[in-house]
């Protein structure tokens, strides 16, 4: 809540006992108001630090508490907003091994448009429809994260070394986090757009 010196002058004046001895225009009241306003504004700023999505001053303490940065993200490589998103994803982890849980994690990591394809259908048999996928029984342990079109990709240029990859794409942070969170008996495939 934004407050001004005038707000505190009115408040302090209203707290004075009634009578001719006390004046609302007392210089002591006007002198105390700026300090009280600063304390109030500082308290408001501290309240914003309690939320991992908006923390700035205490982000290092938040990250130390949550074990971040971890092996998914090298230290010093993220912007403040990316650090806040990763922190929010870790602090507000609701748990669960269902599609909604992983979609929420993708959204918290900045990929709200990503979708998930599951391969938990039965295996293909002679009585299966022609449009059914030809999946072996092992495919029930696979699931695919379809990344949105905004995923970064880098092409090889003339200035790159000869042993460079022709194209590099992917979101290593998202891949690392989801691989850490996925059930140990499943495999995640990450599909990126062309």
Swiss-Prot record:
Keyword set, alphabetical order: Signal
Cited InterPro entries: Phage_Mu_Gp48
Signal peptide limits: 1-32
UniProt xrefs under Pfam families: Phage_Mu_Gp48
Domain of life: Bacteria
Family statement: To phage Mu protein gp48 and H.influenzae HI_1521.
Name this protein carries in UniProt: Uncharacterized protein YmfQ
Biological classification of the source: Bacteria, Pseudomonadati, Pseudomonadota, Gammaproteobacteria, Enterobacterales
